[in-house]
């Protein structure tokens, strides 16, 4: 078993710890994460950007305050926010550090990271540490899902079902036919679109797979043209919530629809397993993905 697969398997336990951390009335999450009504920007790079998108959609749709998500390198200069939240596993990503330095003394900032005493502790005003979810793998799995569990729990979501679903996602067989598929299109709605994007990235990173991701209502506006025999359209959501007629449209292409009907975050665990399995089937090493390092540190 690869180190990546070992870390994938620990996710439900990490989620339990994140929920407990979010519930601490005097803990770092309560003290440092956005308060109701604050106008917030959430930033990150790679996986962290997609988790930022999911959190931003959840926070704003839940009535907690206007929330935007940006890649750290693309946050608009001069836009007013009450707080900026930076998601960074290693705390060393160049673009995140540069942004936090620019904001220092102007906008309150909070970093969510896995590494104590990392460089991000300097320019960030506050920090939430998830060291129990840190990873040695290059590819993020458990840290990304754990930070989103923390953020969701801080918003007041009841996530008691999630660890059970996570264990099921680890134990159940992969959907039939997916290991043989040549292409994957991941679909989500609302916050699950960020999860769809992260799923597509995991498959590219680990297995070099051809993957795409779209908001589900955009799928008919062109992307459905790549679906066909031997290709998968993967819906992160309740099968009953799939837009009317879309399952029939996918069937007419000859493609396979996967709709697992669980919380999108536990659905992402299934994709983690698929990515690692597909990498092995293709003779690739998920612990050593091509052209990637644990953190992007620019000279």
Residue ranges and their predicted role:
Residues 71, 210-218, 256-264:
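A generic structural motif
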Residues 124, 248-299:
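Phosphate-moiety recognition in structured ligand-binding domains
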Residues 1, 50, 54-55, 198, ...:
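Conserved phosphate/anionic-ligand binding catalytic regions in large, soluble enzymes, centered on
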Residues 34-164, 170-171, 189, 233-261, ...:
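Glycine-rich phosphate-binding loops that contact phosphosugars or nucleotide phosphates
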Residues 7, 238-242, 262-270:
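Short amphipathic alpha-helical interaction segments
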Residues 6-37, 126-234, 241-242, 283-299:
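Active-site phosphate/pyrophosphate-binding segments
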């Amino acid at each position: 078993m690869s180190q990546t697969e070992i870390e994938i398997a620990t996710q439900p336990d990490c989620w339990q710890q994140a929920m407990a951390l979010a519930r601490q009335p005097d803990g770092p999450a309560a003290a440092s994460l956005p308060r109701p009504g604050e106008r917030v920007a959430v930033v990150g790079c790679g996986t962290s950007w997609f988790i930022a998108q999911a959190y931003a959609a959840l926070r704003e749709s839940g009535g907690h305050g206007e929330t935007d998500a940006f890649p750290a390198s693309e946050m608009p200069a001069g836009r007013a926010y009450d707080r900026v939240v930076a998601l960074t596993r290693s705390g060393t990503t160049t673009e995140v550090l540069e942004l936090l330095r620019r904001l220092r003394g102007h906008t309150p900032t909070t970093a969510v990271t896995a590494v104590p005493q990392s460089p991000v502790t300097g320019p960030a005003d506050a920090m939430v540490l998830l060291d129990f979810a840190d990873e040695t793998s290059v590819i993020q799995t458990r840290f990304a899902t754990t930070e989103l569990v923390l953020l969701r729990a801080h918003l007041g979501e009841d996530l008691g079902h999630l660890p059970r679903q996570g264990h099921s996602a680890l134990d159940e067989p992969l959907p039939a036919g997916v290991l043989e598929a040549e292409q994957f299109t991941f679909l989500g709605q609302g916050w699950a679109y960020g999860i769809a994007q992260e799923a597509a990235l995991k498959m590219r990173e680990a297995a070099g797979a051809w993957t795409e991701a779209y908001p589900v209502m955009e799928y008919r506006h062109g992307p459905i043209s790549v679906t066909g025999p031997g290709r998968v359209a993967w819906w992160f959501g309740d099968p009953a919530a799939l837009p009317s007629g879309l399952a029939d449209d996918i069937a007419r292409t000859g493609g396979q629809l996967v709709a697992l009907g669980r919380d999108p975050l536990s659905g992402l665990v299934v994709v983690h397993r698929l990515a690692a399995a597909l990498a092995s089937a293709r003779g690739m090493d998920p612990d050593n993905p091509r052209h990637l390092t644990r953190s992007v540190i620019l000279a």
